[in-house]
UniProtKB/Swiss-Prot annotation:
Residues 1-56 form the CpcD-like domain. Belongs to the phycobilisome linker protein family. Rod linker protein, associated with allophycocyanin. Linker polypeptides determine the state of aggregation and the location of the disk-shaped phycobiliprotein units within the phycobilisome and modulate their spectroscopic properties in order to mediate a directed and optimal energy transfer. This is Phycobilisome 7.8 kDa linker polypeptide, allophycocyanin-associated, core. Keywords: Antenna complex, Membrane, Photosynthesis, Phycobilisome, Thylakoid. It comes from Synechocystis sp. (strain PCC 6714). It is found in: Cellular thylakoid membrane. It comes from the Bacteria. It is a peripheral membrane protein. One of its GO terms (biological process) is photosynthesis. One of its GO terms (cellular component) is plasma membrane-derived thylakoid membrane. Gene3D superfamilies: Allophycocyanin linker chain (domain). Coiled coil: none annotated.
Amino acid sequence: MRMFRITACVPSQTRIRTQRELQNTYFTKLVPYDNWFREQQRIMKMGGKIVKVELATGRPGTNAGLA
């Protein structure tokens, strides 16, 4: 199954002391190829930024279907 390994940065939900002080959360997750658009919309809606996207498969050396 084709998967994307995405690294994204989203602002945290909790406000710390002042409104200006924001804390960002970085995370990496595997997203199925078919759900990529939905996940991208979710991150953007939260005010986040996608840092890196890689095509990943479950096992090393597996053909990812790219020519």
